[in-house]
Amino acid sequence: MSENTKVEAKRVFIGAGCNRVVNNVSWGASGLVSFGAQNAVAVFCPKTAQILTTLPGHKASVNCTHWLPTSKFAFKAKKLDRQYLLSGDSDGIIILWELSTLNNDWRHVLQLPLSHKKGVTCITAYMVSETDAMFASASSDGVVNVWDVSFPSQPSEECKVVCLDSICVDTKAIVTLSLAELPQNPGRFALALGGLDNKIKLYSGERTGKFTSVCELKGHTDWIRSLDFSLPLHTTEEIPNSIMLVSSSQDKVIRIWKLVLVGDVGSWRREITLASYIEGPVFVSGTFTYQISVESVLIGHEDWVYSVEWQPPVIDFIDGRLVNHQPLSILSASMDKTMMIWRPEKKTGVWVNVVCVGELSHCALGFYGGHWSPNSLSILAHGYGGAFHLWRNVSSSKESENWQMQKVPSGHFAAVTDVTWARTGEYLLSVSQDQTTRVFSAWKNDEGNEAEDEHWHELARPQVHGHDINCVAMVQGKGNHRFVSGAEEKVVRVFEAPLSFLKTLNHTCAGGEGSFPEDLQADVQVLGANMSALGLSQKPIYLHSSSEPLERNGGGEGLDTFETVPEAAPAELKEPPIEDQLAFHTLWPESHKLYGHGNELFSLCSDHKGNLVASSCKAQSASMAEIWLWEVGTWKAVGRLQSHSLTVTHLEFSYDDTLLLSVSRDRHFSVFSIQRTDNGEVSHKLMAKVEAHKRIIWACSWNPFGHQFATSSRDKTVKIWSVENDARIKQILVLPPFGSSVTAVAWTGLDRNEKSGCVAVGMESGLIELSNVKIIETEEGTTATAALALRLEPFMCHVSAVNRLAWRPTEKCESNQSLRWLTSCGDDNCVRVFNFKF
């Protein structure tokens, strides 16, 4: 196949949630935020609430990320045109990445040698200068490695990373670290370690030597979850002589420790008395003596405190000098669903929480981490549900604070199993093993509504379920927006868009074109949906429902029931919703349940007229591998198609709805003829069953312009087939072998007259390729030619297996016949949207 270089690709959108682990998020001096999304390292811009890229390299789930420099050292990054990012995974691998701030290009610099044998739990760093840094990494096997890194001063140079020391603490895991330079002792550092033994271990060492244990700090009564050193504290003295360490624990308590320079070793030993040790441990580093003592104990959180972080330094005048001043301000994040900002009172010096923000949703399950922005005007939290929460201080006065929630990127926090477009492309719908169904759409910006001004956001969360969701299909045809979903259960569930969603859709880029007019909206009597605490069904909230009296459940006293769950408040949204709204107020009501399958659902599809839905389930026998046909509207079973002996992995109707194609784990595909009689009954007939591949067939797709289709398989091949006039199935083309198992395929039409189209191929490696395919029909039969159109760059593709590809319906491309939109989903928790110019 020759390569056609005329196809231009643009990545439009990435939706992903954060891995549910502590230390996973880092806010860099560049203003960008990094986090782990399965085995990808994702980077997003808080200003636009858009994920900019994902970095491929890790094979295991990413546990932690850390910028060099972070927001704490933003004052040392003003002149840097390159910044760096560290990421560690559950296999113990640490990778160093480079960002060119001039053109926003990313580069894989190196994978650290001698990485950990078990999962990396934490990475911390200290910027010695603009071109030098130290960092430490901890592992669940109790080993802490200390590294020295030198950044290149010239573009032609490379980073130099040296392992200074490897500290074997004990068999218990170390889960948090913090690194700081000792006051008035250049080149000597303090390293604080926290883990599962409730103690803070303090080590001291040089950039060129080993680190030795100097003392232990006791006080916490449960696991230490977070540690953070402050920068040197400026006082009336010219040179600061103290730093602070803040620690948090599962005992719900935050402790502040003060590390003070006592003096040089000789003078201190002359003055040593028993009283010298009352305030706290004393240790020697080099020629200086230090003492560390408890400064304050902060009690306010009601659950485990997972994260504490000092506010980044601010430029301030102290004694007529312009210095980077360390504010006495701490941000804490807890599993009690709150973040707090702690500061000492000016008069008494007593530490109090001056700001408290958090989640009010009953669906919320607490925060794993909290982070300051470089300018300290924003704070970011990430939680158990993989979601981000961003607050910004919008107050114009320095005397008061007004923290308001801001837009953030969102997405699934587990593998995304299926994705589909709305019937005319207004939005896309994805389902995941995180047990949610999500709607993504482009929102209009203030600048305009052209493609360049579109920002994609999560529009709604129609289904929040109790089982992993495997498949989804939009019901095509006229009428309200409807979809069917199948999960790790035997029931197909049908959902219908409520009025609140239809009105919200008018504010999106695509929905404003009147895809569901006002006069049709008047027929929709359901405003939204409620979710019961102990059930899986989502009950409708009617537009004019009468509220029942509170006494229906004994005044609300007694045992908890489904009636104690707060009522959802669905409403028209004029801007992208925040997490609290998405989690509970954007549900779609469930209208029907379809019973029949004997095992968990695996695949669904709808015909293009909106008359039929086909479904399949997991199967190890021919009786279980039946394909069920359901009539839209009555939702009755109108057919049970038998052909396969193992799980049917994918289903698709031809574009004229006369044929149904199925592919299976049994390495066969089947083509069924679907006909409607004059009285509306559905008849079906097996036309052909062909053993098409040597391994499991994962996906199939029809040519929009004819009865040709593509199949993709674990045998790394994609084959093109044609249904001939005499009902024979003929293989007309085999694309050259791919680099890994082909898990997804999708065909879009480009030119009906020339019968040309484009086949998108998604692989287990995460890569995506496009091939131009042209169908040639003659009297002798059908043939086809193909040419490689484009191989997407790895930085644009998924980092794990691609599970589904879907082209946007071509009705949305009529204004620009050369533009096509493709969405994809994968095991890296990501939903992606691309556009291609042919």
Curated annotation (Swiss-Prot):
Pfam families membership: WD40
Pathway(s) this gene product operates in, as recorded in its UniProt entry: tRNA modification; 5-methoxycarbonylmethyl-2-thiouridine-tRNA biosynthesis
Result of knocking out the encoding gene: Narrow leaves and reduced root growth that results from a decreased cell division rate. Increased abscisic acid (ABA) sensitivity and drought tolerance. Higher resistance to oxidative stress mediated by methyl viologen (MV) that blocks electron transport during photosynthesis and by CsCl in light. Accumulates anthocyanins. Reduced defense gene induction kinetics and salicylic acid (SA) accumulation mediated by pathogens (e.g. Pseudomonas syringae pv. maculicola) accompanied by an enhanced susceptibility in npr1 deficient plants.
Compartment annotation: Cytoplasm; Nucleus
GO cellular component, one term: cytoplasm
Tissue specificity field: Expressed in leaves, stems, roots, flowers, siliques and guard cells.
Subunit structure: Component of the elongator complex which consists of ELP1/ELO2, ELP2, ELP3/ELO3, ELP4/ELO1, ELP5, and ELP6.
Role summary: Component of the elongator complex which is required for multiple tRNA modifications, including mcm5U (5-methoxycarbonylmethyl uridine), mcm5s2U (5-methoxycarbonylmethyl-2-thiouridine), and ncm5U (5-carbamoylmethyl uridine). The elongator complex catalyzes formation of carboxymethyluridine in the wobble base at position 34 in tRNAs. Promotes organ development by modulating cell division rate. Prevents abscisic acid (ABA) signaling leading to stomatal closure and seedling growth inhibition. Involved in oxidative stress signaling. Prevents anthocyanin accumulation.
Entry domain remark: Folds into a two seven-bladed beta-propeller structure which is required for elongator complex assembly.
Protein family (similarity comment): Belongs to the WD repeat ELP2 family.
Record protein name field: Elongator complex protein 2
Gene designation per UniProt: ELP2
